[in-house]
Each structure stands twice: as C-alpha cells, then as structure tokens.
C-alpha cells in the first residue's frame, strides 16, 4: 500500500494562533514518521548490517572512516584466500538484496517499470519511495526504519530540472560500506550543471578542455585564465596530442575563442550521445558503452548506432579507431578534471567518506563540426535522449538494453578473488610493484580497502559485455595529465598515493589482458578495426592503401569532410555509397554506372546504406522517391533489390530523377551434403533470439531411440495443429551448425505425425468446398501454396491488398476467396474494422453452406488477438454459419530487426508475443476452431525470412526458372526444401510435392511449406458435412 501524506492542516475557519501552531507541529511530526513508498522500511531484514546511530554517522562525515589496519599477505594458499574472502564478506558484504527506487515528482512510468523489472531479475526486493517536491532523499528519510536495511538506492531521472539533488554529499557519507547508489554527487554537480562545467573550464584553462565555449557564454562568464588553477606544475600553454593528429589541426579545433566561436546545433554536422558509466572516484574508473545515439540537427533525425559504425560510416573518419580514441581522451580529460575540481572545491566539506560501491551512468552530448573534432556540449546525470516526452520505440528499446547491460555489468555473479590472487602473484613475482612508477616499494601485504578496489576492477573487466574501458587510460596524454595533477597536489593529502592506485589498476589491466589473450585477444577494443598497423604512418585515404578493402568501403572519399557545391552546373549523381557492413560492389562503384550486385553471407540480416552527392541541390532518397537519405534494410534470403533515387531540385533542371539499383544476394545457411554417418540434432529456439530463456537453445543431440520412434509406420496422426515439436536436421556435429545438411531439415511433432496428402487425395478432400482466407501477407502465402498444390501450377499472382476470387482451382471444383486485413495504409478513422471486413468477405463469397464444406482461414503475423476470435464467433452466429470449419493461423516471428519504415520489437516484447499466442490457441479451442501454431514453427528459424521490411515473410512467389529474365541468377536461388524428405516416413508421399517448373510462378519457402501442409492436414482431418 502506498502511504499518502495527510493534509488536515488546511484552514476551514479562523482558529486561534495556538491551535494553528499545534496542528502544524503535528503535521511536521507525522512527516518524520512516514515513508511515502510502496512499503515502509521500518524493520531491518534478517542479516542486515546493524543500525548506526545518527551521532556516529555525523561523526563519520566529519572524521571519515578510520583506515582498516588489518593486512593480508596473499601467498596464494587456500587458507589465506578463504580468510580474505571471509573478511571481505564481513567488511563489505550484505546478506540480502533490497533496493529503493526513489521516484521524483516528475518521473517516467516506463523508466520506473523498467528498473523494477531489471532489479527483480537480479534478485532484488524493490521498494518504491517518493518524497515531497524538491525535498530529495534527506538523512531523515533514509534513516527511517534502519539505514542498514537496504543495499541499493536508485534515483530515477526527473523530466524537469530540480534544484535539489536526489542525494547529497552529506547524505552519501552516512551510507554503510555495503550500500551503493546510482549517484556520485562529487562529479555530478560540477559536470551536469552548466555553471559547474564552466567553472571547471575556467579553473584549468591550460588544459584546453574540449568543452563548447557556449557553456560559459550562457552563464555570462568569460573564459579567462583563473588564478585558482594552482594544481598544475606550470601555466605554460599546452597543445595536447591525442594519437597522431597534426598540431595545426588541434590548434584550429581546441583553442577557445569565446567572443568569436559560438556553437549552435545548426552549426554542427552531427551530435553524438555517448553513455559513460563511472564506477569509482579516486581512483577514477569509467567505462563507455559501445552504443550511442546520433542526432542530425540539419535533418532533425535521431537514430541509435554502434560507435564503431558511427566513426566508420557516418563520421567517415579515415581512421575510425583513432577517432574513437580521441573522443575517449576528451571524455577522460573532462572526468579527471571534474574529479580534481570536486576535491579542491571550497563548497561543502573537504573531507568526507566516499561511497565505495556507488556509480553513475552519464550521457555526454558531443558535437562534431567541420573539423571532425569532439566538443562536449553538455553532460546529463542520467540516460538522456533528445526528446524525453516523445520517446519512440527505438528510444525505449535503447533505454532497455542500456540499463540491462549496465546492471549485468555492475552485478555479475562470478567472484573475482581467485583471479585477483593469481594476478597479484604475477605482478609481485615480476617486480612490477617495485617499478619506477612507485615512490616507494609496495609491500605484498594489502589492506581490505586495497583488495576491494582491485577486486572490483577485475570483476568489472570480467563482465564488460558491451562496455569498454575508458579510465584508467593508457593514453600518454592522460597519463601525463595525471602526473600534472597528483604529483603536486594530491586530494587525499598523501603525495603519490592516488597515482600509485592508478598505476596498480593499469598493471592489473595489463595482466588481465595477458591472461585472457587466448580466449579474447582484444577484450576492450573493437576487433573489426584492422588499420592499427597504419596508425603510426602519415594519414592517407583508405582507398589509396592496398589490401585494406576489408577495413572500410573502397568507395570512401579521400576527405573526412563532406562538401557539396551550390553551382547549378555541377552534375547531379551519386558521389559515393557507404554501407555497414562493407559491401563489395560488382562492378566497382562509378557515378555513371547505375546497377550493382553483391553477395552477403547468411548471418548478415541487415545493411545500413547512405549516399553522398557532390551537389547541394541533389537529393537522395532510399526505398521510395520521398524516402530517407540513409536507412537500414532487412536482407531476406536470396535476392534483395534496393532502389536509390537521386533528384536534382535545382530550378534549371526541374527535379529530374536518376535511379540507381543495388541487388544484394543473401546466401542460405552454410550446409554440407548428407553423409552416411551423421548425428540427428534438434532445436526449437535459436540462441540469438531467446523466447524461453529458461530452456535450451540451438542444436541439441537427439537419441537414436527418438528417431526410431518417429519412423514407425503406426505413428498416430496429430490431433491438432499446435502439437509440440522440434526442427530436426542431420549434422556431423551438433556443436557446429555449419556441418549440417539444412536441405534435409524437417519439423517433427512429438509422438505424432501430420499426414501429407497426395495430389489426388487433396483434390478429393477440397472438391466442392469454398475456402475463405482473411488476413495479411502471411495468410496470402499459405493460400498461394494451396493453389499451387492443387493445380500443380500457379498461373497468376499478385500482391493482393484487397478482395480477390480464384475460380480456376482444382478444375473449377474449389472456390478460393481472399481478403487482405488489416489495411494499415488507410487512416485508422477510415480503415474498415475486422468485423466489417469479415462480413464483406462472407457476403461476396455467398452462397455458403453452414457445414464443413465452407472453410474460413484467419491469421496474421502479429495483429491477431483473442478479441478477433470473439468477433468471428459473433459474425458467424449472426450469419447462421456456426457449423463451418474455422482454422486459426496464429502469430509468427517478425518485426525483430531494427530497420527503417516499420516498428521494432524488443526481445521482451517478442517474448510477450509467445504469451499472447497461447491465449489465442486457448480461445480458439474453446470455440471449437482448428489451429495452426505458426509461432512455434517460425521462432527457431527467425533468420530465414524472405523479402519484406517486416522480417516476417517465410514465403516468396517467384517467376519460373525457365523465365529468360532469371537465367543469369538461376543457380543462385535458394533450394526448394521438401518437408521431412529424409527423416519422415511420409517421404514417398512428399515426392509428389516437388514443384512443376513449367508453372509461370512458384511459391518458395520451406517454413511456409511446413505451415501450409499442417493447415491442409487440418482441413482434411475431419471433413464436416453437417
């Protein structure tokens, strides 16, 4: 129950002053007793850390924690290791997982629910706390119940800027050793406020911090040297040299000119939001996520992208790894300056206890202008998107996986004690702790504080996931800066100690890399960058370097800067095409060549394409003539055709149109021919898209007894179309799917079989019947398969998006009608309802018998739900057709790819589809309808989709291979899979399903074939004649 504040204090009449004061005092006393949350934190949970009195906490804030005097000699023996582990658990450990979610007055419900879900998955009991406007979590609120009764505090972000932080420095010093919060006030306040950021820049003008001058101009301040920058050894002007950038270029981009240079969004070619997780201060530890959000101010377009793709493709840096390192150095310099600024600030207590496990996920807004050098525009104290009030599906998906990655990184299950002991022994034996970087020899004896710091760092390195190490940094510029800061003025008052901690972490990092070299050669870098050998060489265009085609597209421009001409006489054509992943175009790109072809392997399911033109009034559109200038495409198996429209909008040419065409062939799964000695392997779900995380994924060995059982001739017929089963494929090894013969794959239900009818049996079963289909393109694919099975040919085909009748099926003995639903291209207010569409189809198909001679097939990829089944029953009852055969084709996999033009489902949303699918199956059976469970069949083969933006099509109607139009690619067509040709005892019957290649058209797609055959078996299982 959420405890609400009581407001009995509002004046209804004019009482005496004494009564007013009494009532006010009662209200204030009540507020000190009540925690506004989803439950009260009044009882300490079992095993909680003993309560600490307010006096002790206040004293701690003034004096700080006394340093732990206990010392451990890590000899490597088991007894010493166990002793260290026990001491660590006593000193820092917690016996439970209890989290407080602090909800500010203006919060996001989506963010709240997301944190609840993620923390619950990590085993936390979640308590929601709220407080009055602008109050924050003060000492009194956190102290209620028991300060030791919780382990984790999460301050949710506020949609509106508030003056009071969620938790202050003064409160942080009262936290127990085991407690952590997602706030670091020491750097949050100076970094995430413009006035604080400006003060940092003014404090250290010699550093030429890469911060936009507009930050200080907004505050009415001038960027003049400050007399308080006494931490540096010298005040001589410095030019920082990240990587191999030229001195001239750095001078142009980093020198501050406050009265002349004002960065505005429209002046920047692109703004990148980089997400940085800070896990410690003094020593500073920080990590950067491999994903960022890009905002294109001129085009007002926002999209999420891997940082690797950003630097390779969108920023067009000649050396992407170097550009990334420069950005990391810029962020690292600012973080280090903020840490030192906080320690030497005159605001607040100068000595206070640090929260050893606290962390903060920051968002850095980084602008890139014409010089392609990073400039920090703003730092946000939480995950930030361009428009929080209008977050789209992509934003919500990005927030979800960023938070998932963050908490998986922070709360790994593995212990790091054993690897810590091994690393430490390696360092000590190699005399690393006695090197020149240390001011005195470091004894092998370490305190718990030192052990905890190094162990936490090792644990972080072992659970990086999508994060990469940002700080401590091996960059010479950053290391030089650390010497500048800490050799002269050490914040903790012990010269050299902070620097010693940094060196120890860097040495640990080096040893960790060495130990993991065999399993992960470059654990903290992008493996795909292959230009490292050329970093030390003068920068030249990559298209001028031999044998570098695999690193970046060959067609890239020589210059990093993008220029276009306003001259009307400049020809309008494509200057270059850039793609991710890199595509080898055939022929090589040339502006005058309009058609290109390339091939990609099976695992490449999407491609991002962008185009550059030399003329400013020459506009490029993908997909269609009004499409975007760059976009992500899904790549179905086989041929994918992409059109690139180039329009000259200059007045002299009157919007002339030029079309370029790109054909991308995506290969089938790598497959080996079937050998005599093979292993039967089965799978239900792919490990790349887990629907049931608790169940196995990928290929699993199948026993010979199981194979013998399903090959028995007396195996019973399946009683329904949703029997549980699995895909079975012969392989040399179930641990390597490249050793399988995927041509022989079959869908096999457990303990039963679906009968595959011969052509005469099927013609007899469907003779005299009317079959009505209503649904989307997935239903249409099954309909075309049925027509081809009955006629052995498909004479006509079109992508029907309305209502169509087929009278020439089965020699005219079977009538088939089809209605496309839903008509998503029509405005919702004008779009026909499902009830209207169904009534229209029934009326157009009359006369209809109220028997099994009339078959209604309803299905769609993801729009169908149980409410539609209620509507079907209502309409059939009204039309006196309750006795007809109704077959429900359930949901299917799709919309799982982040591509332009369609919505994108997160993994959790795809998992929710499974639950909805179960509801549809249950509701259909209650109404007496037949079902075909297409979701279970498609989810394990989600990568095997064919053409279409949705990634949901498992069928394709193609012209016959005899067509002259397809002669040049006939050997590249995907194979026509025969359902269960090897494993099933139906093999002889199934030979009759081989395609008649004299047909003008053919429906291909093995998964659609399986679903269609199950549907046909249900049509003919119990032919109703009532």
Curated annotation (Swiss-Prot):
Span of the signal peptide? 1-34
Per its UniProt entry, which superkingdom is the organism in?
Eukaryota
Output the Gene Ontology cellular-component terms. endoplasmic reticulum
Where does the UniProt entry place glycosylation sites? 251, 404, 413, 737, 791, 985
Xref: InterPro entries: Cadherin-like_b_sandwich, NXPE4_C
A Pfam family hit:
Cadherin-like
> What family name appears in the similarity comment?
Belongs to the PC-esterase family.
Q: What is this protein called?
A: Cadherin-like and PC-esterase domain-containing protein 1
- The scientific name of the source species is Homo sapiens (Human)
Gene encoding the protein: CPED1
């Amino acid at each position: 129950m959420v405890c609400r504040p009581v407001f009995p204090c509002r004046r209804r009449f004019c009482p005496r002053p004494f009564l007013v004061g009494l009532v006010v005092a009662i209200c204030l006393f009540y507020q000190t007793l009540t925690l506004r949350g989803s439950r009260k934190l009044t009882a300490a949970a079992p095993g909680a850390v003993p309560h600490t009195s307010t006096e002790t906490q206040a004293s701690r804030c003034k004096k700080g924690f006394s340093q732990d005097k206990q010392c451990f000699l890590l000899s490597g023996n088991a007894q010493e290791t166990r002793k260290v582990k026990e001491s660590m658990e006593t000193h820092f450990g917690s016996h439970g997982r209890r989290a407080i979610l602090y909800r500010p007055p203006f919060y996001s419900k989506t963010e709240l629910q997301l944190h609840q879900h993620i923390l619950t998955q990590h085993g936390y009991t979640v308590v929601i706390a709220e407080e009055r406007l602008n109050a924050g979590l003060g000492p009194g609120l956190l102290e209620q119940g028991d300060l030791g009764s919780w382990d984790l505090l999460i301050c949710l972000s506020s949609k509106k800027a508030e003056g009071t932080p969620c938790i202050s420095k003064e409160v942080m010093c009262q936290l127990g050793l085991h407690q952590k919060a997602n706030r670091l006030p020491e750097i949050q306040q100076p970094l995430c406020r413009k006035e604080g950021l400006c003060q940092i820049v003014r404090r250290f003008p010699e550093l030429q911090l890469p911060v936009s001058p507009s930050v200080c101009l907004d505050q009415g301040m001038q960027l003049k040297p400050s007399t308080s920058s006494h931490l540096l050894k010298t005040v001589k002007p410095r030019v920082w040299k990240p990587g191999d950038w030229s001195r001239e270029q750095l001078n142009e981009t980093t020198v501050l000119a406050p009265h002349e240079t004002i960065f505005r969004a429209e002046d920047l070619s692109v703004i990148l939001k980089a997400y940085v997780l800070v896990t410690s201060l003094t020593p500073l530890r920080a990590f950067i996520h491999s994903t960022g959000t890009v905002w294109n101010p001129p085009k007002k377009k926002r999209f999420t992208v891997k940082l690797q793709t950003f630097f390779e493709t969108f920023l067009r840096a000649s050396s992407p790894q170097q550009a990334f390192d420069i950005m990391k150095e810029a962020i690292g310099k600012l973080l280090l300056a903020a840490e030192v600024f906080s320690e030497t600030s005159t605001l607040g207590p100068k000595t206070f206890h640090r929260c050893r496990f606290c962390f903060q996920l920051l968002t850095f807004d980084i602008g890139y202008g014409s010089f392609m050098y990073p400039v920090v525009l703003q730092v946000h104290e939480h995950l930030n998107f361009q428009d929080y009030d209008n977050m789209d599906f992509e934003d919500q998906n990005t927030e979800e996986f960023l938070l998932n990655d963050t908490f998986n990184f922070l709360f790994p299950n593995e212990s790091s004690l054993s690897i810590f002991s091994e690393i430490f022994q390696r360092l000590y034996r190699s005399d690393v702790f006695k090197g020149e970087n240390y001011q005195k020899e470091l004894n092998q004896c370490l305190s718990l504080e030192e052990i905890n710091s190094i162990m936490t760092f090792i644990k972080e390195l072992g659970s990086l996931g999508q994060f990469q190490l940002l700080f401590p940094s091996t960059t010479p510029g950053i290391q030089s800066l650390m010497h500048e800061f800490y050799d002269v003025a050490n914040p903790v008052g012990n010269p050299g100690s902070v620097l010693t901690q940094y060196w120890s972490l860097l040495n640990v990092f080096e040893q960790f890399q060495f130990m993991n070299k065999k399993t992960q050669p470059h654990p903290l870098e992008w493996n795909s960058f292959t230009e490292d050998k050329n970093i030390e060489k003068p920068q030249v265009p990559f298209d001028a370097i031999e044998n570098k085609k695999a690193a970046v597209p060959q067609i890239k421009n020589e210059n990093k800067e993008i220029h276009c001409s306003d001259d009307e006489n400049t020809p309008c054509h494509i200057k270059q095409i850039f793609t991710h992943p890199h595509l080898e175009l055939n022929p090589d790109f040339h502006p005058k060549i309009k058609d290109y072809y390339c091939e990609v392997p099976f695992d490449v399911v999407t491609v991002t394409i962008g185009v550059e033109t030399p003329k400013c009034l020459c506009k490029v559109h993908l997909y269609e003539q009004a499409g975007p200038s760059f976009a992500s495409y899904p790549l179905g198996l086989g041929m994918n055709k992409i059109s690139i429209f180039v329009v000259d909008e200059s007045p002299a040419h009157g919007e002339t149109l030029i079309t370029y065409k790109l054909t991308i062939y995506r290969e089938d799964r790598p497959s080996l021919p079937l050998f005599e000695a093979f292993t039967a392997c089965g799978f239900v779900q792919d490990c790349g898209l887990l629907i049931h995380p608790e169940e196995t994924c990928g290929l699993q060995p199948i026993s010979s007894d199981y194979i013998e059982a399903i090959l028995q001739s007396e195996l019973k017929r399946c009683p329904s179309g949703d029997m549980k089963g699995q895909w079975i494929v012969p392989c040399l090894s179930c641990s390597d799917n490249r050793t399988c013969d995927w041509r022989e794959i079959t869908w096999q239900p457990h303990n039963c079989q679906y009968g595959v009818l011969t052509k005469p049996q099927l013609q007899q079963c469907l003779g005299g019947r009317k079959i009505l289909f209503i649904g989307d393109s997935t239903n249409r694919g099954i309909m075309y398969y049925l027509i081809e099975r009955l006629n052995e040919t498909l004479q006509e085909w079109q992508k029907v998006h309305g209502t169509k009748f087929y009278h020439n099926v089965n020699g005219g003995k079977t009538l088939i009608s089809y209605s496309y639903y839903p008509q998503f291209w029509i405005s919702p207010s004008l779009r026909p309802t499902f009830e209207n569409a169904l009534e229209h189809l029934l009326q157009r198909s009359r006369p209809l018998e109220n028997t099994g001679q009339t078959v209604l097939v309803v299905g769609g990829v993801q729009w169908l739900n149980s409410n539609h089944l209620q509507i079907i029953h209502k309409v059939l009852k009204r039309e006196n057709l309750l006795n007809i055969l109704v077959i429900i084709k359930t949901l299917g996999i799709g919309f799982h790819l982040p591509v332009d033009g369609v919505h994108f489902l997160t993994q959790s949303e795809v998992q929710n589809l499974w639950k909805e699918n179960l509801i549809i199956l249950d509701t259909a059976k209650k109404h007496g309808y037949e079902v075909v469970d297409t979701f279970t069949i498609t989810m394990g083969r989600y990568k095997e989709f064919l053409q279409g933006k949705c990634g949901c099509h498992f069928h394709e109607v193609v012209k016959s291979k005899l067509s002259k139009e397809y002669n040049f690619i006939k050997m590249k067509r995907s194979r026509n899979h025969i359902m269960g040709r090897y494993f099933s005892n139906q093999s002889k019957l199934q030979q009759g399903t081989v395609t008649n290649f004299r047909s003008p058209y053919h429906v291909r797609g093995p998964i659609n074939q399986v679903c269609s055959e199950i549907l046909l078996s249900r049509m003919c299982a119990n032919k109703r004649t009532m």
